[in-house]
Amino acid sequence: MVRITKVHTGGGDSGETSLVDGSRVPKSDARIEVVGTCDEVNALFGLVLMESNRLSDTHSDGGNRVTTRRVKDVCNSAIGRLQSELFDLGAELACPPDQIPEYMQLIDQKDSDRLCDEMDAWNEELQPLESFILPSGSGPIAAMHLARTVIRRLERSMVAMKDGMRPISLQYVNRLS
């Protein structure tokens, strides 16, 4: 486990920051934008978790309790795992091009495939869509819509950055969006 003993260094006061290998880049560097957007998605997933756990087990109209519990269960298992994967992805993206340390935990094809399998399974539980869904709904749903739009921004930023990125990382974010 990583132990952080100091949360400030002053090293970024001049507008630069460090990559994983210790090399310095401007905070305006495309790689730093990508890492920051990945971090933003992770924070939004934390908001989704918080909002889902605030849901009552019953609806004000006496509606289906199973649905609310299912949302909580899915959020706590799937989103918790996604947060860990996004943390790993952010670390990978904070490496200089083609300089990923051997010890680093990386997103792989099984992670990308699992996303598709989970989405297919969840989709089977839903009624077919007849149109696009407007971003609204309960707290966790609205937060998930916001996370989805930031994931799409992350994907666009990754495509714009290009250099040294593993194709599976881009595929994973595309599937996540």
Question: Which ranges hold each PLM region?
Answer:
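Phosphate/pyrophosphate-binding loop motifs in nucleotide- or prenyl diphosphate-using proteins
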Residues: M1-S177
